[in-house]
Structure formats: C-alpha cells, structure tokens
Amino acid sequence: SVVELGKMIIQETGKSPFPSYTSYGCFCGGGERGPPLDATDRCCLAHSCCYDTLPDCSPKTDRYKYKRENGEIICENSTSCKKRICECDKAVAVCLRKNLNTYNKKYTYYPNFWCKGDIEKC
C-alpha cells in the first residue's frame, strides 16, 4: 500500500515522499504523460509499469509486510499479490536512492500540463 511504499522511500532515500516524490516530474505521483524528465522520473515510470503487471491486485491499498536485513528490503511471503506489490515498491525505492544525485528540486510540483509528447512505453 502507499503506507509501506512511503516507509520504504524514507528508509532508502531519507526524503519524505510528500512532497519530494508525490508530484515530481511527469510520472511520480500519477499523471503519466510525456517522456520522463530525468532518472528519478524514470524510476516512477518503471514503478507504474510494474503495477500494470498486477491487474488483479490493489497495489495502493493492499497492505504487506517487509523487513530490512543488513540495509536491504526483504519482502515477506504472504499472498502472491502482496509479495509482487512489495517487490514493485522495493524496486522503486531502491531506484530512487540510486538516483538521488540527479534529483532536481525544480521538478517537484511539476505542472502536469507541461508533460507533453509520447508516453514512453514500459
């Protein structure tokens, strides 16, 4: 769910998801128009694509359990849906951490109508 995703983002990046990622670029926090603006925005596109592979799941509301061992996120076995949601969320949190060096504050609260052009395919 968004609760676990938020915790993962804080743990991986040290940034609060709101406002750092909830309206960043063209893909973080929804919107999904135009090409990604940078590597951080591309992480959010990949996360959206991952969720698209889970049509029978409810990634924003299904709660799941995970733990951290030696700094790594470990998704705990529960239902197939919850495990797959957790893996999608883990991937985006790790991606955001790996791309902290290119995080650009000017893309926070980026107006969606500026996102033009073809959407990059998954």
UniProtKB/Swiss-Prot annotation:
InterPro entries: PLipase_A2 (IPR001211), PLipase_A2_Asp_AS (IPR033112), PLipase_A2_dom (IPR016090), PLipase_A2_dom_sf (IPR036444), PLipase_A2_His_AS (IPR033113)
UniProt GO molecular function: calcium ion binding; calcium-dependent phospholipase A2 activity; phospholipid binding
GO terms, biological process: arachidonate secretion; lipid catabolic process; negative regulation of T cell proliferation; phospholipid metabolic process
Region Important for membrane-damaging activities in eukaryotes and bacteria, annotated ranges: 105-117
Tissue: Expressed by the venom gland.
Chief location of this protein within or outside the cell: secreted
SUPFAM superfamilies xrefs: Phospholipase A2, PLA2 (SSF48619)
UniProt subcellular location: Secreted
Protein keywords: Disulfide bond, Secreted
Cystine pairings recorded for this chain: C26-C115, C28-C44, C43-C95, C49-C122, C50-C88, C57-C81, C75-C86
Activity regulation remarks: Suramin inhibits the myotoxic activity.
Function description: Snake venom phospholipase A2 homolog that lacks enzymatic activity. Shows high myotoxin activities and displays edema-inducing activities.
Recorded family membership: Belongs to the phospholipase A2 family. Group II subfamily. S49 sub-subfamily.
Name recorded for this polypeptide: Basic phospholipase A2 homolog ecarpholin S
Organism: Echis carinatus
